[in-house]
């Protein structure tokens, strides 16, 4: 039986936008396994108790999707300061309990300036409508992240900054590879809207959710339909295989869910 959203959310102290990918309905009528993957916002507020609860749940690897400049509280250069201008304040990588493997594999490549300018011009950034273009045009970073996750020991928590866009893209790929139903993938993405409100409030950072929804509405979409649009027009497994991910790696990624 599919899990409810409440069942999947992880209320570990200091964690935000954290939820398990288990309990989601697949196209064959089964549901995804619990415990293999947890998605999250960054761990800046995670307490020792929260981190221990994460470990006790079975997580043994944390994958950080952020760029270097997002991990330096004091900018190293004017370029770093500019890159962080519209992001939540940077924070160092979390200090994890002994025995937890940590790896950082940046998903974005800021050097693809023309691509990101186009995504802004098309008003795709901050919405799931950038998933397809990234996978089609710059899949190498997605492959690098998924390769690291496939090779990681044990169960995996992965996060970016707020746990919505880059984390959402990785989740989109993982759930598509596990043959999760389109509406379930879309619903999971949409959960971040409510889950991020207290995170933004604690940071005293503007919550852009209303603006994101307004942009999507102008384009004839909701959060859910925007995710479905990306899935309808993309064979995720084929794109990743063409970009160098192996079938063995895909099977290892799937094994935590099916």
Regions found by a protein language model. Give the residues of each.
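Cys-dependent protein tyrosine phosphatase-like superfamily
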Residues: 1-157, 162, 169-258
């Amino acid at each position: 039986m599919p899990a409810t959203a409440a069942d999947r959310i992880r209320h570990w102290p200091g964690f935000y936008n954290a939820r398990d990918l288990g309990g989601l309905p697949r196209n064959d009528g089964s549901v995804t396994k619990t415990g293999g993957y947890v998605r999250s916002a960054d761990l800046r507020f995670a307490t020792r108790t929260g981190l221990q609860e994460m470990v006790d749940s079975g997580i043994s690897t944390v994958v950080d999707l952020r760029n270097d400049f997002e991990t330096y509280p004091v900018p190293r250069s004017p370029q770093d300061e500019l890159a962080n201008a519209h992001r939540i304040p940077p924070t160092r990588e979390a200090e994890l309990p002994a025995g937890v493997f940590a790896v950082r594999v940046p998903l974005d490549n800021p050097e693809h300036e023309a691509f990101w300018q186009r995504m802004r011009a098309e008003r795709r950034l901050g919405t799931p409508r950038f998933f397809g273009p990234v996978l089609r045009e710059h899949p190498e970073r997605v492959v690098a992240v998924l390769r690291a996750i496939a090779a990681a020991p044990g169960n995996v928590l992965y996060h970016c900054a707020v746990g919505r866009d880059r984390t959402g893209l990785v989740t989109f790929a993982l759930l598509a590879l596990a043959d999760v139903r389109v509406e379930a993938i879309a619903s999971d993405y949409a959960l971040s809207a409510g889950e991020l409100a207290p995170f933004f409030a604690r940071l005293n950072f503007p919550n852009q959710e209303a603006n994101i929804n307004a942009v999507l509405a102008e384009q004839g979409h909701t959060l859910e339909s925007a995710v479905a649009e990306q899935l309808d027009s993309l064979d995720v497994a084929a794109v990743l295989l063409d970009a160098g991910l192996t079938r063995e790696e895909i099977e290892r990624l799937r094994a935590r869910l099916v």
